[in-house]
């Protein structure tokens, strides 16, 4: 185990992801956190505008053009002597696989909910994934300055739809045009709301230990009475916060505010400092690895191609689990059974990166990837272990890709290989011909790949529909059975980027029949990286 200094570094780190249904305000919350962390001076306008300003966390050209988040941004900043490692996940559901992998690298989630819309479809899916790892969740009800539903109605919906017990920490004073602020339920501090100039941070607090008379005068008799009744009801209905239950993922503390107007963001950050865990252990195939351990371990959860278009580089994002990164450290690339010297790791602020001398558990560092690193790879100071829990998901939509210029075939294979490595798309090579089949979770992924091939690799390509509706990875310990299966079903089989065998079914009926015939073969929807 390490010394007191190492324990201090662990204690001041929080690694968390922001998750939400699209348009709930996730990217806005991210921007306002960066403002409070004093790493940017103004926030972007989130959607493409004529003045050329965009969200800092949306750094890819296509994100700026479309006004959506399609890739994970990693950002590190300090707030009140706490080092925050923030992972802003893709907002669009077509890029959910990237989000799932990111949740394996964090210790806490911040869930953003639109106060008018409440729980939406993607919200449920994200919470189910966080539950796989028992990741604790803090909830922020956003957009209180717009017309919204009653607070207690939203809390009831969270408990019913997400099976999470809510513990309101703050309580809204009305909403929409009448939104007056929030009250901290237990210490009775009131934060009065004033609409700030958009994109400008107001560091002056409106907190007031208001006495009964002045608060009643400010709110008016009716609203004052309503607030008192709601606070009494909340105190009666909802139990007090328990950090133990929170860390187990059984309850979620709930905060209210308006991210666009910088109201309530400081409460989120303070809650993360107070309740979110410092870096926790991770599981390998053989044992747990604790963050206090002396020797370095880490795993790659994301690869990004062409962060720097001038150099065509590929960056591997690594979550440090234990030990300490030091410039020039010798690391074991476990899957490749090779040792490497890492002298140029860096930290991130969305698309920007900065060289670092050292890093600790909970930190996300970037290292250069020359084509040998894959998502899920483990790095150690010599121990032969493998971190688990980073999945690939079977794609749900498929296309065949063609070149407008056949002479670019070599460039196309290279581009698709790199985009596949980072998880932007899945590439399959049929066993019976030389075509290339792309698989994705959603249609938008295909549009993004075509655009990235054009911008980053100077390749013009088009798609055609293909008679495939389902894909399943094939697994069996019996080599004879697999060999027989391949010989009889080659027209439905392909290899993925890792040379894993996959069955491409034209419809559900076909898959059901083949599974019934080969009931001693596993047809799997997910595959461990």
From Swiss-Prot:
Q: Which residues form a coiled coil?
A: none
For this UniProt entry, the molecular function terms from Gene Ontology, in alphabetical order, are:
GTP binding; GTPase activity; guanosine tetraphosphate binding; translation release factor activity, codon nonspecific; translation release factor activity, codon specific
Q: Which residues bind GTP?
A: 20-27, 88-92, 142-145
Keyword set, alphabetical order: Cytoplasm, GTP-binding, Nucleotide-binding, Protein biosynthesis
Can you cite a GO biological process for this protein? regulation of translational termination
Would you identify the family this protein belongs to, as annotated? Belongs to the TRAFAC class translation factor GTPase superfamily. Classic translation factor GTPase family. PrfC subfamily.
Write out the function statement from the record: Increases the formation of ribosomal termination complexes and stimulates activities of RF-1 and RF-2. It binds guanine nucleotides and has strong preference for UGA stop codons. It may interact directly with the ribosome. The stimulation of RF-1 and RF-2 is significantly reduced by GTP and GDP, but not by GMP.
Question: Which HAMAP family has this protein been placed in?
Answer: Rel_fac_3
Protein name, as recorded = Peptide chain release factor 3
């Amino acid at each position: 185990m390490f010394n007191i200094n190492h324990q201090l570094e662990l204690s001041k780190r929080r690694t968390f992801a922001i998750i939400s249904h699209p348009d709930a305000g996730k990217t806005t919350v991210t921007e306002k956190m960066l403002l409070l962390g004093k790493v940017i001076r103004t926030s972007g306008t989130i959607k493409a505008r004529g003045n050329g300003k965009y969200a800092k966390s949306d750094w890819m050209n296509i994100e700026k053009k479309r006004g959506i988040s399609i890739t994970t941004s990693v950002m590190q900043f300090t707030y009140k002597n706490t080092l925050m490692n923030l992972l802003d996940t893709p907002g669009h559901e077509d890029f959910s696989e990237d989000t799932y992998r990111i949740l394996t690298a964090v210790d806490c989630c911040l869930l953003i909910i639109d106060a008018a819309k409440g729980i939406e479809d993607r919200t449920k899916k994200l919470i189910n994934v966080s539950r796989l790892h028992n990741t604790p969740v803090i909830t922020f009800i956003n957009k209180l300055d717009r017309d919204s539903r009653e607070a207690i109605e939203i809390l009831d919906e969270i408990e019913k739809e997400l099976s999470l017990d809510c513990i309101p920490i703050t309580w809204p004073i009305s909403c929409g045009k009448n939104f007056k602020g929030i009250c901290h339920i237990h210490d009775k501090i009131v934060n009065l709301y004033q609409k700030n100039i958009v994109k400008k941070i107001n560091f002056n607090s409106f907190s007031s230990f208001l006495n009964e008379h002045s608060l009643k005068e400010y709110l008016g008799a009716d609203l004052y009475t309503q607030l008192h009744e709601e606070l009494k009801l909340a105190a009666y209905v909802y139990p007090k916060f328990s950090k133990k239950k929170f860390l187990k993922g059984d309850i979620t503390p709930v905060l209210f505010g308006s991210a666009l107007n910088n109201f309530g963001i400081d409460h989120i950050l303070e809650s993360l400092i107070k309740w979110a865990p410092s870096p926790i252990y991770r599981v390998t195939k053989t044992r747990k690895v604790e963050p206090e351990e002396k020797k370095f371990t880490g795993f790659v959860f994301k690869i990004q191609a062409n962060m720097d278009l001038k150099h065509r580089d590929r960056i591997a994002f690594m979550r440090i689990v234990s030990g300490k990164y030091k410039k020039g450290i010798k690391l074991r690339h476990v899957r490749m059974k090779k040792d490497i010297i890492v002298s140029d790791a860096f930290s991130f602020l969305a698309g920007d990166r900065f060289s670092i001398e050292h890093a600790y558990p909970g930190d996300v560092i970037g290292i250069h990837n020359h084509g040998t690193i894959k998502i899920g790879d483990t790095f150690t100071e010599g121990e032969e272990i493998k971190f688990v829990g980073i999945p690939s998901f079977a794609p749900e939509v498929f296309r065949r890709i063609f070149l407008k210029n056949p002479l670019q075939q070599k460039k196309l294979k290279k581009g698709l290989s790199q985009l596949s490595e980072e998880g932007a798309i899945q590439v399959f090579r049929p066993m019976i011909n030389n075509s290339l089949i792309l698989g994705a979770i959603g249609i938008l992924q295909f549009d993004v790949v075509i655009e990235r091939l054009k911008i980053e690799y100077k390749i013009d390509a088009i798609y055609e529909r293909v008679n495939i509706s389902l894909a399943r990875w094939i697994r069996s310990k019996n080599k004879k059975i697999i060999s027989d299966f391949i010989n009889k079903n080659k027209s439905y089989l392909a290899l993925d980027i890792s040379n894993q065998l996959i069955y491409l079914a034209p419809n559900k009926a076909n898959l059901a029949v083949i599974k019934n015939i080969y009931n001693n073969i596993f047809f799997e929807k997910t595959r461990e990286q």
